[in-house]
Regions:
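A glycine-/small-residue-rich N-terminal strand-loop-strand element
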Residues: 24, 31-60, 78-80, 133
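C-terminal capping/lid region of NAD(P)-dependent oxidoreductase domains
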Residues: 112, 175-180, 191, 250-264, ...
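Glycine-rich phosphate-binding loop and adjacent beta-alpha segment
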Residues: 132-150, 188-252, 291-292
Length: 293
């Protein structure tokens, strides 16, 4: 593949691992949302990066042999962290940290409901909440996934495909509701989740469907704060904030303050097997494609 020269403040990274293979309805980007590799070239305005450096990167559409992106949006991988492990961290941890810590300001003792908690963002969110000392309520779609999140320290584990979680949350909080809901459900289950947020609490919307216009929420939801999260928008509007979060979570994962995410690697030539594995929806690992060399 032909690789162009980097712009003034850009870096070109030769991919070693690519993660984030899911395609969402309405998505306009190509496949691949994060990964890791080595620098092959940097622009004349870039300092602190050199050819050969190992980098992790959140870059939508990065399922390609080389990725060109702004230098501030990459993060050097510490020596203690494997490149395969690093590839699965960027989007999951940036999303979870931004929602929980920058928007919701999760604190010790607060109750956080995490939907679909066995996925990458969910597992990252659980690790962040454990570190913060929050109570974790979590949902997942089958028994195996629920067993996993129970092992990860969830106090209350429920079925993400059944409306019964709403009653369980209200019972466990004596009718008060959760301080924070990290949502990825849709339809009726999304509506139920909106009504589980206590007055003054925070609803973080990760889904791409059913997102409500800010300032247009039903008055019945009281004083709840509502934030949709979109990393493409965050990278465009607040690149320094996103880069700061990225650097912090990579460092914390390398130093053991946050948990690494489980990964399963496939050779790039075996991409069909990787996609079939992903579409089976039974996995609880981050799927990574491994490039040659």
């Amino acid at each position: 593949q032909f690789v162009v020269s980097p712009g003034l403040d850009e870096a070109i990274v030769q991919a070693a691992q690519t993660a984030g293979l899911a395609v969402y309805p309405g998505a306009v980007t190509a496949i691949g949302s994060d990964g890791a590799g080595r620098v092959t070239a940097v622009g004349s305005g870039v300092t602190g990066l050199h050819p050969g450096d190992r980098l992790a990167l959140p870059a939508f559409g990065c399922l390609r042999s080389h990725v060109t992106l702004p230098a501030p949006m990459v993060c050097r991988i510490p020596d203690s962290l494997g490149i395969e492990q690093a590839a699965g961290l960027p989007v999951a941890y940036i999303t979870a940290w931004y929602g929980l810590m920058e928007l919701a300001h999760v604190k010790a003792g607060q109750t956080v409901l995490i939907h679909a908690a066995s996925g990458g963002v969910g597992l990252a969110a659980m690790s962040i909440c454990r570190r913060a000392g929050a109570r974790i309520f979590a949902t997942a779609g089958n028994d195996r996934k629920r067993a996993l999140i129970r092992e990860q320290g969830a106090e209350l584990v429920m079925d993400s495909r059944s409306a019964g979680f709403a009653e369980e949350v209200m019972k466990a909080t004596q009718g008060r509701g959760a301080d924070v809901v990290l949502n990825s459900l849709t339809g009726e289950l999304q509506e139920l989740s909106l009504n589980l947020v206590r007055d003054g609490g925070t609803f973080i919307e990760l889904g791409k469907s059913g997102v409500r216009p800010l300032g247009n929420l039903d008055n019945s939801l009281g004083t709840m704060r509502y934030f949709p999260v979109d990393l493409v928008v965050l990278g465009d509007t607040e690149p320094e904030l996103m880069a700061g979060i990225f650097s912090r979570v990579i460092r914390d994962c390398a130093e053991g303050r946050l948990d690494l995410l489980p990964v399963r690697s496939f050779d790039i030539d075996d991409y069909n097997t990787a996609f079939r594995f992903m579409l089976a929806t039974r996995h609880t690992v981050k799927i990574v494609l491994r490039w040659p060399g």
